[in-house]
């Protein structure tokens, strides 16, 4: 199941706050910048069907550094397979476990998200970022 992970404020100075946003066991960092109301991955060109990423060898730990994003999560092994999760700048870190279909929509002004991923040794970026068309996976399409 996905999880919202709080982080700790460890220091304040005039007009400045410091936070420890460390994710234990993270071994990869991705900075993902959306300009405007981007959808990732984009809808299928031919049909307009929703498309998703699914990482077989990676857990995502997403922190909105600027703006906000709405995540659509589907995991067919969960009792409730479909969830919509809002990620806001200054909010919790969203953990998306491996094997979860996910896509996101940024706010109108865009967003910047830091992913402190946990990749296992079998991870290959080409395979981890494969796009899945929901129309071609009946159970995924029905869940959304």
Q: Which residues does each PLM region occupy?
A:
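Active-site region of the double-stranded beta-helix
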Residues: 1-89, 106-144
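Histidine-centered metal-chelating micro-motifs
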Residues: 91-104
